[in-house]
Each structure stands twice: as C-alpha cells, then as structure tokens.
Curated annotation (Swiss-Prot):
Its EC number is 6.3.5.-. It catalyses: L-glutamyl-tRNA(Gln) + L-glutamine + ATP + H2O = L-glutaminyl-tRNA(Gln) + L-glutamate + ADP + phosphate + H(+); L-aspartyl-tRNA(Asn) + L-glutamine + ATP + H2O = L-asparaginyl-tRNA(Asn) + L-glutamate + ADP + phosphate + 2 H(+). It comes from Brachyspira hyodysenteriae (strain ATCC 49526 / WA1). The gene is gatB. Heterotrimer of A, B and C subunits. Pfam families: GatB_N, GatB_Yqey. This is Aspartyl/glutamyl-tRNA(Asn/Gln) amidotransferase subunit B. Allows the formation of correctly charged Asn-tRNA(Asn) or Gln-tRNA(Gln) through the transamidation of misacylated Asp-tRNA(Asn) or Glu-tRNA(Gln) in organisms which lack either or both of asparaginyl-tRNA or glutaminyl-tRNA synthetases. The reaction takes place in the presence of glutamine and ATP through an activated phospho-Asp-tRNA(Asn) or phospho-Glu-tRNA(Gln). Coiled coil: none annotated. InterPro entries: Asn/Gln-tRNA_amidoTrfase_suB/E (IPR017959), Asn/Gln-tRNA_Trfase_suB/E_cat (IPR006075), Asn/Gln_amidotransferase (IPR018027), Asn/Gln_tRNA_amidoTrase-B-like (IPR003789), GatB (IPR004413), GatB_C_1 (IPR042114), GatB_Yqey_C_2 (IPR023168), Gln_synth/guanido_kin_cat_dom (IPR014746).
Length: 483
C-alpha cells in the first residue's frame, strides 16, 4: 500500500521584548542563573500577572506578516502540568480564543531533479504564552538537576500550522521562511542555539488519497532546521515500516537522536483534557482597538517574498542571487545601497557581496551590520575597475584593507600607490624591455607557438608588479609583436 505523510508544526518563538510576559524582569539571554527573577516568576502566592503591551504588539505584527486574522478579543488560559522548571505548575497561554487565526505561508520547494513547486501552508493560530524555566543537569554523573528560572515567564508566541506539510523538505522551507519573516519584522532573533526558536513536529501517515488522519506522534529535540527535516523523514519511514509489519502506531512523544538519526519513544502523548485548560481568572479579556492593529500594520517592512519579487524586477538577478541577498534584510539593503551608488554593475556587485563580503563575515562571525566598509565603497570598487584605475586582482587586495580600516578604495589606492598602469606609452616601454630580455619567446611566438604569448604577458605583469591593465597589456603586446 502507498502512504502519504500528514505533518503539522508547532513553532515556539521567543519575542525580543525588553521585559517578560507578565512581570517587569529583564528578558535577556546569558545572565547568571536565577538573577533575572522576581516573586511573580517564582510563582509566590499572591503575585498577579500584568500583560506586557510590547508582547501583544509584536504578536499582532507576527500575525499580520503571516496573513492571519487579528482577533480584537482574545483570552489567556492556564495549562496545567507538573515539571520542576514550572514553579506555578501551570503555564499562562491561550487556548480557545487566540489572538491570531487563519493565516498562511507560501513556500517554494525544490525537487531532486532541480524542478520546483509552490505550496501554501495554512496557519491555524498564533497565540501568546509564557516560557518555562530551564533544567541544568549535573555533568558529574550524579542524579541531580538544577533549576534556572531566568527564562521562566519570558514572552513566547506559538505558531501552529495546519497539517498541510507532506515532507521533511517542505517543513524545512516553511521554517526557513517563517524565520526570515520574524527576523524581518524584528519580533525575534530566532536563534535556535539560544532557544529563541524551537520546533515540534506532529507526524502521521495514511493511505494515499484517504481523508482520515492516522495516529500522530510528536517529535521533539530538534535543534536545527536540518534536524527537523531528517527527523521527519525518518519518522515517516518508521511509521510506514511499522504499518507494513502489522504494528500499531502509538500516540506518543518521541525524541530525535541526531547522532543515530532516529526517533525514540519518550512518553505517551497527552491530550488537551490532560492539561485541564481553563480561563485565567487573574487576567481580564484582552480587547484590542482598531488603531492598535493599524499601528502594527504601518510598522511592517517589506517582507521577504515582496523583496524577492522586487529585486527580480528591478535588477534582473538570478534566483540564487536573490535567495542569498534576501536571507537577511540588512544584507539586501546593503546591496541596494551599493547599486544605487553605481547602477552600471548590479550583477557584479551581487557576486562580490555573495562571495567576498559573505566569506569575510563568516570568517569573522559577523553580520553585515558589523561590516566596516560602506555600501558605497563596494560600488566604488567597480567604478574604479570600469575606469581602468584598478584591476580585479588589485580590487581583492584593497578589499582586505577596506575590511580592516573601513577606508574608501580610492584612498587605499592613493596611499599604497597601487593604481593600475593604463598609460599606453608607459606599457609600451615596459613591454619592449620585456621582449628584449626574452628573445627566444619572441621567436617562438612568431613561429606560431601561441603559448609563448602567455609567457610574455606574465613577464609584463611581473614587470608592472601586477599593476598593468590586463586588457591593454594584451593589446599593446600583440601590436608590438606584429611589427
């Protein structure tokens, strides 16, 4: 029997608010354990939650950017469960009345043969909730864990997709696009290493063409988008194999083991009834005004898909260039600033940013915001090349200095005296001397041995210390040899 997978993703995103969701404790990463807490974070009796206005505002932006309907009335609820890093033994979240509903995200998926297809993934809801604390397990082998409540109470949104995803690759592309959007609108840094973005996958299979859903498993412990893809693909194969062997699929939570590329059963999967949801009596109904939603709309920047379409239209760049440049909104802005400064070479500027600039940033573990050279300086490189002032080789040499000092290319060329030799008379003098010193190569060339011409070009470039204009060197050399 042929099966198809039905996959839904639950993506938790920590918002980059100044303070936590329901108290005034700072929302920062990396502080010493239990230094960013208060009686409310620690669930002391009698402490009351106060809804963070910035959290609400950023959630509205996230909903609008993912084509959701913003509900003017929404309600917080309590989700009850026992875990050491949850001191109140319940989490403040939203259940029946979330703030964002009925959205969608469009993705493009590449096939193995190089073709691609577009797909729209529906978003069931985006709701607000508070984060739990963190357990730090003893690394000496003792059966001991420490509780760090710095993260407890931090602002989270949970983005729940409909089960419209069919493969690990589709999940990967969905997460990639979602991350881009949330970074573009500045609601989160989406750093998986710091726990700012976490993803769980609900995976089930059913006979192809069937409309009934199979028994689902929830897969956790995936710390990269690549691992999400691998875990889902493994779980699909595992479930198909189990059904073909006459086994039943258990509704359970499974953990992904990246070393073995397998999923392993952890516990039976809870249902909503197990959490005993009910409206939080300490938080009134959240009522939004039209102007609050309109303000969030006004703050939305050009989103990734819009930017991709515009770059294609304005600069006629290849798709691969557009994908790389729009990975980061700041990088795309940097590119456009460079092209505006020198509109003649949009493709060459794109190549330079993708290769030279990105290589430097990756080496230094920096972002484009940390990059010293201005966009106009990248543009000036190509202006100098087109004017014959420098060669491509010299451009790479001065680029290293630009990265260290932030100086303009023209200033570095002037300071180091490495301007390209483009004076025909000067080149002719140098070339005639080279020919005098290499009579055998001259004779070989005139005897039809074209390779000797390359040797003479090399000797000329050596004589100019690499600063000869390559095009002029070739032209003048051929002219003199033909005399």
């Amino acid at each position: 029997m042929e099966y198809e997978a039905v996959i839904g993703l639950e993506v938790h995103v920590q918002l980059n608010t100044k303070t936590k969701a329901f108290c005034s404790c700072p929302n920062t990463f990396g502080a010493p354990a239990n230094t960013l807490t208060c009686p409310r974070c620690q669930a002391h009796p009698g402490t009351l939650p106060i809804v963070n206005k910035e959290m609400v505002h950023k959630t509205i932006k996230a909903g609008l950017a993912t084509n959701c309907t913003i509900q003017k009335k929404s309600r917080f609820a309590r989700k009850h469960y026992f875990y050491p890093d949850l001191p109140s033994y319940y989490q403040i979240t939203q259940m029946d009345e979330p703030i964002c509903t009925e959205g969608h995200l469009d993705i493009t998926v590449l096939n193995d043969d190089g073709s691609s297809y577009n797909k729209s993934i529906r978003i069931n809801r985006i709701h607000m909730e508070e984060d739990a604390g963190k357990l730090v397990h003893d690394d000496t082998g003792r059966p001991l864990s420490y509780v760090d409540l710095n993260r407890a109470g931090c602002c989270l949104i949970e983005c729940v997709s409909e089960p419209d995803i069919s493969t690990g690759e589709e999940a990967y592309q969905y997460l990639t696009e979602l991350k881009k959007i949330f970074k573009y609108i500045d609601v989160s840094d989406c750093n998986m290493e710091e726990g700012s973005l976490r993803c769980d996958a609900n995976v089930s299979i059913r006979p192809k063409g069937s409309t009934e859903l199979g028994t689902k498993t929830e897969v956790k412990n995936m710390n990269s988008f690549r691992n999400v893809r691998l875990a889902i693909d493994y779980e699909i194969k595992r479930q198909i194999k189990a059904l073909n062997n006459g086994e039943k699929i258990l509704q359970e939570t499974r953990l992904y083991d990246a070393k073995e590329n397998t999923t392993k059963g952890m516990r039976s999967k809870e249902g909503a009834a197990d959490y005993r949801y009910f409206p939080d009596p300490d938080i009134p109904l959240l009522v939004l005004k039209d102007e609050e939603i309109e303000q969030a709309k006004k703050e939305l920047p050009e989103l990734p898909q819009q930017k991709r379409e515009r770059l294609k239209k304005d600069y006629d760049l290849p798709d691969q260039d557009i994908v790389v440049l729009t990975e980061d909104a700041a990088l795309a802005d940097y590119y456009e600033s460079a092209v505006k400064a020198y509109p003649k070479q949009p493709k060459k500027i794109s190549n330079w940013i993708m290769v030279e600039v990105n290589a430097y940033l990756n080496k230094k573990l920096q972002t484009i915001k940390d990059f010293k050279p201005k966009a106009e300086h990248i543009a000036e490189i190509f202006k100098l090349i087109d004017e014959g002032v420098i060669s491509g080789k010299i451009a790479k040499e001065i680029f290293e200095d630009m990265c260290e000092t932030g100086e303009a290319p023209s200033a570095i060329v002037e300071k180091k005296g490495i301007k390209q030799v483009s004076d025909t008379g000067e080149l002719e003098t140098i070339i005639r001397k080279v020919l005098e010193e290499n009579p055998k190569s001259v004779a070989d060339f005139k005897a039809g041995k074209e390779k000797s011409f390359g040797f003479l070009v090399g000797q000329t470039m050596k004589a100019t210390k690499g600063q000869g204009n390559p095009k002029l060197v070739n032209e003048v050399l051929r002219k003199i040899l033909s005399e």
